[in-house]
């Protein structure tokens, strides 16, 4: 469906920002698809973007105090750094966000450390900068580094760590 004032189906971005926040609007616009293609607006999908950001926020309460990457999450973190880096370079924001969603699901399944959460915050920062800066402050990273999350260097992946150290197989 094409948006048009004459059809009365235009979405006012101010209303979306007021209801869900600027980061949700920003994330949703980047998630709905390629910038060069027509995309269909979906209020339900906007709510899904908000749920994803809420899930990221709630990870702060789950993270253990370790600054190291957890063994269970190390491979998915390095795969995600590789994927998000490549996708941003190719302006494929939707697939970069999808990779972050997959990683967050793994964090919920495996648990996470503060080190794992820090990697998520750094990769999520271009998509939800306001929320990430709040998280950066609340997790003590701002005090520890003396910088904002957006001032940190982009994380680098180690190709050798993109493969899981062990695989469980049903017999």
Predicted feature locations:
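Active-site and channel-lining beta-strand-loop segments
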Residues: 1-8, 167-171
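Helix-rich, typically C-terminal accessory recognition domains appended to large enzymatic cores
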Residues: 15-171
